[in-house]
Amino acid sequence: MNGTNLIKIAVRALANNKLRGFLTMLGIIIGVASVITMLAIGQGSKRSIQAQISEMGSNMIMIHPGADVRGGVRQDASAMETLKLQDYEDIVDETRFVSAVSPSVNSSGQAIYGANNAPTTVYGISPDYLEIRRYKVEDGDMFTEQDIQTAAKVCVVGKTVVDNLFPDGSNPVGKVIRFQKLPFRIVGVLESKGYNSMGMDQDDLILAPYTTIQKKILAITHLQGITCSALKEEYTDQAID
């Protein structure tokens, strides 16, 4: 049976049962439309995720100490003391594919101002962290390298921290808040970034000199991490090597 005869038989079958033919065609149309819609949604989601990753820093590299295994039990990587300040300095001096580097230590606790308090996380970093994570200071200034050298008790805060501690809308710059009983003078407020694709509030944070957090809150000399930014996204692999 050739193709022409098959087409004739199919046409006669559809003509004899127009309702079935209509439903068959409708099913095909709906199926094709569904596939096109899902592809469009997939492309839209892909673009949205790519945009959010780019906002976080698509060329960002995070270095953490490897977790040790003792007695068959994997230890908490954050407790490892193998990552030193010298490692950070070596990256700054020797890596030609990296544009910005920041040490990283952090601690969670209550931030307090007057009668207001809220749980948050303080990140001990260097000013390069803003470039790496694409944060901008909206009001006031970023703390300086001099503040790092002196382990100054200064900080820059996110909008969520401002809303929680200053619900009356007063300007927080110049005010002194407390974190784990340690006073910090606010020198700047970050521009809002909102929530990321994982549902994390990128404005619920305090940034302070890493030396201050190391010495006066954590009482450690090692680093919990190093965050870098490759010169270009395509240089990320070379920077890691």
Task: Name each model feature, range by range.
Residues 1-30:
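N-terminal Sec/SRP start-transfer signal
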